[in-house]
Amino acid sequence: MKFFGVPALMLAGACSTNSGSLAPSPQSHVAAPRAVSHDRRWGPNVSAACPDRRPDEAQCFLLIRTGPQLVPDGGSGPNGGFTPAQLQKAYNLPSATRGSGQIIAIVDAYDNPRLADDLAYYRSYFGMPAANFTKYNQLGQLGAYPVGNEQWGAEEDLDVQMASASCQNCSIVLIEANSPSAKDLGNAVKAAAALGAHIISNSYGCYTACGLKEKYFEARGVTYLAASGDDGYGTGVGTPGAFAAVVDVGGTTLVAGVKGKRGFEESAWPGTNSGCSHKSKPSWQHDPGCAFRTANDIAAIADPNTGPAFYDTYGFSGWLVGGGTSASTPLIAGAFGLAGNASSQNGGRTFWEKAHEGPNDLYRITRGKNGTCKPAYLCQEGTQEYRDYGGPAGWGTPNGIGAF
């Protein structure tokens, strides 16, 4: 089988878990058009999972490596992808001992009827316990799921697996919107909060006025996270990431096999969005080069060339290597789950106010850029134009859970 130009991959085993979902009929399954790489920042062997969106819809940000691994120091998992153990080590996450009782909600569009089985296989393959996982429709109900869509289905697989990778003991709920429209996604976000999730991860967005409403991202006691996007500097800062109550998550290139205590190094990933948004400047941001909401707040692995391994049997044939800020966002959501303080946090404000309290709680990113800009700190790391801040990676990447 081939899809999006990705060769069929030999499966390492078979799933036997009951998904607990209502599989759509063949008539309700949507295989959207083939997506192709259109951004040189991604590299020659990377494709976008979701096609370009309609003006009134959000777009998922999953990127998939479609060719051989070009970077020798990637992960040790299938196809050279990073494993959960490597990600936990890279970010110093106490994943085995914390997170019980925490709920991470993932919001996406459309259905993936294979998702529970894919998640079960991913966790079993990497030696994690069975997941506490539940899938809901956009009204927060079991059953009556939307039509299936292979592209968004792959996004859903990556999201729940990355949340598992960083917080294996967290409960994970997936809320499937009927479509990527602003209204449907907003209702799904609202349902996630009503279900009791204090952490809501959103790996989608739009750079123009698609109609996403800020009111859906303002529930008390909820930490919202959003992917910043994968088009580099200059395409804008989209929503929902630009909303003041949302943690805007950027991306890095993570490399393994480095000498030193950590064993990894990171630089800004050229594909991550960052910069000066069109939303009002929050009172807790004081950087001098942007009169509006500045992005990003924090970051994690996003470069699909050295991305995490994930598993999809709905539109693909098993193991893939993915990336984009779709990978970093649920991974950071898991870090909030490990810390257990999400109900008392306040979006991106957390990192802007705490960035100087515990300098060892975040790995400062000092290299890399995602474009050319003035002032340079909005698109480049290590400038020291505004303290340790750089737009692509925000205040840094997790070093444990002290910053959360």
Give the ranges of each region predicted by the language model.
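Short, surface-exposed amphipathic charged segments that create phosphate/polyanion-binding patches used
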Residues: 148-153, 189-190, 261-267, 380, ...
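C-terminal motif of bacterial Sec signal peptides marking the signal peptidase cleavage site
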Residues: 13-14
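A residue-level detector for conformationally permissive "hinge/kink" positions
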Residues: 5, 221, 316, 326, ...
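Substrate-binding/charge-relay-adjacent region of secreted/lumenal peptidase catalytic domains
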Residues: 25-251, 274-324, 329, 340-349, ...
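An often Trp-containing, charged/polar helix-loop segment at the C-terminal end
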Residues: 18-21, 333, 340-391, 399
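Sec-dependent signal peptide recognition
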Residues: 1-8
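Residue-level signal for mature regions of secreted extracellular proteins and peptides
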Residues: 8, 43, 53-54, 365-366, ...
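Polar, glycine-rich mid-to-C-terminal structural blocks
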Residues: 248-276
